[in-house]
């Protein structure tokens, strides 16, 4: 027998796979936070657990939000459910890669230093590309939902558009920079997020966003998480 609070939650957050990924992300974030406090190892000048913690929190917000939005899907429900399942599964793949590499003291993003690292990076890039496509399709299922008020529907449309654009900014970070492919500068890295300077300079605490140059991660973050704010 469900309690009243459990019943309300099951009505609000209706996609089982997205709920499962949200719970897994929450548990993972709590573990990463604990390790962040007690594991002194560093990678690129910060705790090895900083990146996993950020991505786990982001995945928690993302999956919980889309589980809530799924409750407003009023057409092609089975197909929308399939897209939600795909998002949930591939985010788990992405998170496992990030957490696994960090726990070994290795970078995940932009790392092409060996066939193994290229494989991990390619897997991550493929997974998140499919997540983008599945999010777009799920968003189309919500576009004309009659289960929302007119104002909420308009807010969700704007939020989806901005979130998809924000997610898309990540793709602009992946091409190798000219200096990275010069033989004398080769360091096994292909891609960057800083504009006008090399990655790894001074940045904001925890977020790491550059304080000396442009940083594509800022627009990526605020674009992606507009879906939690606008509706």
What residue spans do the PLM features occupy?
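Hydrophobic cores of alpha-helical transmembrane segments in multi-pass integral membrane proteins
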Residues: 17-37, 49-72, 84-103, 123-138, ...
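Short, Lys/Arg-rich, polar N-terminal cytosolic tail immediately upstream
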Residues: 1-14
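Helix-boundary and loop/linker segments of multi-pass membrane transporters
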Residues: 10-11, 113, 206-211
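Hydrophobic, aromatic-enriched interface-forming segments
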Residues: 131-190
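Non-cytosolic membrane-interface motifs at loop->transmembrane helix junctions
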Residues: 43-52, 110-123, 151-154, 183-184, ...
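Membrane-interfacial catalytic/cofactor-binding modules of polytopic membrane enzymes
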Residues: 175-226
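Membrane-interfacial loop-to-helix junctions in multi-pass inner-membrane proteins
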Residues: 12-15, 77-88, 149-156
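Internal, conserved structured core segments that host functional sites
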Residues: 109-147
